Structure formats: C-alpha cells, structure tokens
C-alpha cells in the first residue's frame, strides 16, 4: 500500500523505521517492568505507593543521623546535669571536702623523736588500776586473756575505685573472727602523728591504746590487707604465758642470718606492760619521715640480708633491733612458725580447693591457714607489686574462703570461691535448734562466759 503513495524505495525505508520503533518500544516496556520490580513496585502495584516507599528509604539515613544527634545531645545534657546537680555524687568533686584545712605542724629537726613522755612505772600503775576496777579484768577466764585487735587505714579514700570495697571486706572478715573468739576490735582512720606516716603509723596508735586500755592484756595488730581464713582456730594463749611479743617468724633467720623477711610485722601480739612501752621506744627512732627514715633505710639495707634499697620500714627495723640486741629483748619474744599468724598469700591462695577437699578449719597452719596476708598487693594504692587482676581475684577468693565458714552456720555457702552469690546447703526446719553445728562456731567453747564469779 505504501508503494502506491511513496514508491518502492521510500516505502521500504518507512517499513524498516516502523519495525525498529516497535523493537524500541518493546525494550522500553521491558526496562520499566524490570526497574519497577527492583525498586519494589510489586509490593504495592501503584506508582504513588512506590514513590512513597522510595522516599521512606531515602529518609532513613537522615532519621538515623537526627536520632544520633538527639541521643548525643541528651547524653551531654545528662552529663552536664550530673556535674551541676548538687544531689549528684557522680559529678561531685570529692577533693572539696578532702582538702586539709590547716598545714601540717612543723617539727624541730634537731629535737629527738619520741612517741610520748617517758613512762617507767607502767606495770605499777596498771596493777593498781586493775585492782581498783575488778569488773574489767585483764583475763576473761584462766588462759583466756582480754585481747584488742587493732587495724586501720588511711583517713582519705583509696587511690583507686575499688580499694575501699576491699577494705570493707577486710574489716567485715575481722569482725566475724573477733565476734566468734570474744575479741574486741578497734578500727583506726586517724593519723595520730604525721611524722610516723606509712609503715610506722601503727606505733603511736599502739602505744596510745595500751595506755588507754589497761584492762587489755594483749593487743593484736593486723594490717588491713590481711584476712582471717581459719575462723575456727583459737590462738594457743597458754604457749605465750612467758612472752610479751609474738610474731610470725623463724629464730635462725632473724638471729643468725639477719634476714629482713625473717619475721613479719603485719600480724603480731604485744602484751600490755612496761616491756611493751620500752620496745616501742626502741623501735620508733627509725620511723620519722624524711632524712631520718631515708638514712636509716641505708643502714638496714647494709646490715640485713637481701634487703632492697628503700627507706626504713617497721619490719626491717624490728629484725635489726632483735638481731643486734638479742640479750635485751630476745627472751620475751616468741617467733611463731607452727601456724600462720601471718601467711604469705602467694603460696596459699591456689591451694584453697585442695584444703577444702582434704582438711578442715581449726588447724591454722599450711593445711588451713589462720591468716592470708596480701603483702605487696596494696589494694588501696595506685600501684602494687603484683598484677592487679590476680590480687583482686585472690582477695575475693580468700574472703569467700573465710566467709563460707560463717555462712555455713546459717545454711548457706558461696557458689564458688570466685562467686559473690550464695546457695542454700540445707533445708529449713521447724526445729532449728536440732541443727548440729559441725565446726562448733555458733556457740564455741572459747567464747563461753565464765560465771564462776
């Protein structure tokens, strides 16, 4: 038909163009179908709905950015509120109330140091007081002296976030032992003499307590980083009837070798009397901080076996005092090694499970140590001598090891030595007094009152 109007050649060109147009149109339709399937047209079936879905997808990124911005803004506002809200502990600067109000009193460097006025008749004064105050006897019953356990820590918070928590565990542990054994306890937070800071702070405190409590027969000093791990062990008081100072140690290491770790002053017993005042006066001169302590440290390092170079400490000074003046003091000093009045944690803590399996409380020695002492961990300081994680984990284990002996009286125990959680180990009963206390800690014989008088 086209040949009639355009001629053969022109008609062929038009027919070819129509065929190409059909192909182009078909390709266009296929492209639209594919694109609609890819962007979700099949979900809704109408262009308007497809457009809405596309817009919603494109808007997500903006929404996320706006939410992050809003969250950041809210977090900043909360932080700002914590810093400005007077009721918030988080934003409070603790240094505002910890700052010392007055400078330390300066001491005369030319004046010899003294713990206090010289007292030479304390035995007579004390005997008179005890006679005039019969309701405060120095012995609760025969072979059971009145004992005051003394411990303490810095008047300021610890220098790390968890130190005070471990101090709390430590004093709770000591309270438990003292309650079971009829021992009084004194916790000190005051630095009584600024010159005797650090290792030496215990000496002025001990002297003051001995003089203020003549009814106390033995004062038991115990460092804050030491814990009781045998709640059932009662000290063999009869063994010490002729001694005035009891420390964990070995005679040969102190008197023969002059080894600076031949004894430990982290846990010791001191009998109240003139002898105690005299040895405190002899012990103290190396303690004043500054040049005296530094120079004394050099002497101790030179004279004592294997001692590192550092300022004078109370333990090294005691070793030096006993080794160089054995004739004066040695007869009244008992170096105890039959049980752990002090037990170095490094050789004990990994054996707790073995002890539980094979032994029982009440032994006090390597089989079930009375005291586990975390020497060098310094849980209240910024840095210790051992990895922090190991120290804290093992302090938790030591606390739980001792605490289990308390909890078992009431039917509970820790899930494990590493766990704060507890579990029930016996069922409740309507006859609770029929329960048999296997360790004998609920009503121990060593706590029974003496009613003979």
What are these regions (language model features)?
Residues 155-166, 195-196, 298-309:
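Short, flexible/disordered intra-domain loops and linkers
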Residues 125, 136-140, 174-176, 209-210, ...:
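Beta-strand elements of modular eukaryotic interaction domains
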Residues 154-156, 192, 226-227, 251-253, ...:
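Short, solvent-exposed loop/turn segments at secondary-structure junctions
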Residues 185-187:
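A structural preference for short, hydrophobic beta-strand core positions in alpha/beta folds
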Residues 2, 192-193, 198-277:
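GT-A fold catalytic core of metal-dependent nucleotide-sugar glycosyltransferases
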Residues 168-183:
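Short, acidic, metal-binding catalytic loop of nucleotide-sugar glycosyltransferases
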Residues 24-31, 201-204, 208, 275-452:
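Catalytic core and acceptor-binding pocket of nucleotide-sugar-dependent glycosyltransferases
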Residues 1-166, 383-453:
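Juxtamembrane luminal stem/stalk of type II transmembrane Golgi/ER carbohydrate-processing enzymes
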């Amino acid at each position: 038909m086209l040949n009639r109007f355009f001629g053969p050649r022109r008609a062929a060109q038009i027919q070819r163009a129509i065929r190409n147009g059909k192909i182009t149109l078909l390709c266009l339709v296929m492209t639209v179908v594919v694109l609609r399937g890819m962007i979700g047209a099949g979900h809704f079936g109408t262009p308007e709905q497809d457009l809405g879905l596309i817009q919603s997808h494109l808007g997500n990124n903006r929404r996320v950015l706006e939410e992050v911005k809003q969250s950041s803004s809210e977090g900043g506002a909360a932080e700002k509120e914590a810093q400005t809200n007077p009721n918030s502990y988080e934003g409070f600067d603790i240094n505002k109330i910890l700052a010392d109000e007055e400078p330390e009193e300066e001491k005369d460097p030319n004046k010899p140091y003294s713990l206090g006025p010289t007292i030479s008749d304390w035995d007579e004064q004390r005997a008179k007081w005890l006679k005039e105050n019969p309701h405060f006897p120095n012995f609760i019953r025969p072979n059971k002296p009145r004992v005051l356990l003394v411990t303490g820590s810095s008047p300021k918070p610890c220098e790390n976030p968890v130190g005070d928590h471990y101090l709390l565990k430590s004093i709770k542990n000591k309270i438990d032992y003292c309650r079971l054994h009829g021992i009084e306890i004194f916790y000190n937070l005051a630095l009584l003499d600024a010159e005797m800071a650090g290792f030496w702070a215990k000496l002025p405190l001990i002297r003051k307590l001995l003089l203020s409590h003549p009814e106390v027969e033995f004062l038991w000093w115990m460092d804050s980083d030491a814990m009781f791990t045998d709640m059932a062990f009662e000290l063999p008081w009869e063994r010490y009837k002729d001694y005035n100072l009891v420390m964990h140690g070995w005679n040969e290491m102190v008197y023969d070798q002059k080894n600076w770790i031949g004894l430990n002053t982290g846990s010791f017993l001191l009998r109240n009397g003139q002898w105690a005042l005299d040895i405190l006066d002899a012990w103290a001169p190396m303690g004043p901080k500054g040049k005296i302590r530094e120079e004394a440290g050099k002497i101790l390092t030179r004279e004592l076996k294997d001692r590192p170079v550092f300022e004078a400490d109370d333990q090294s000074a005691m070793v030096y005092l006993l080794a160089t003046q054995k004739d004066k003091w040695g007869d009244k000093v008992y170096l105890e090694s039959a049980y752990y009045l002090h037990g170095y944690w490094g050789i004990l803590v990994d054996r707790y499970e073995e002890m539980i399996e094979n032994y029982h409380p009440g032994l006090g020695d390597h089989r079930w140590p009375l005291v586990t002492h975390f020497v060098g961990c310094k849980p209240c300081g910024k840095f210790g001598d051992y990895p922090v994680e190991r120290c804290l984990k093992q302090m938790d284990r030591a606390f739980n090891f001792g605490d289990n002996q308390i909890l078992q009286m009431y039917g509970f125990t820790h899930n494990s030595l590493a766990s704060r959680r507890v579990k029930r180990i016996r069922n409740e009963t309507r006859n609770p007094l029929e329960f048999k206390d296997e360790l004998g800690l609920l009503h121990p014989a060593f706590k029974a009152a003496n009613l003979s008088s």
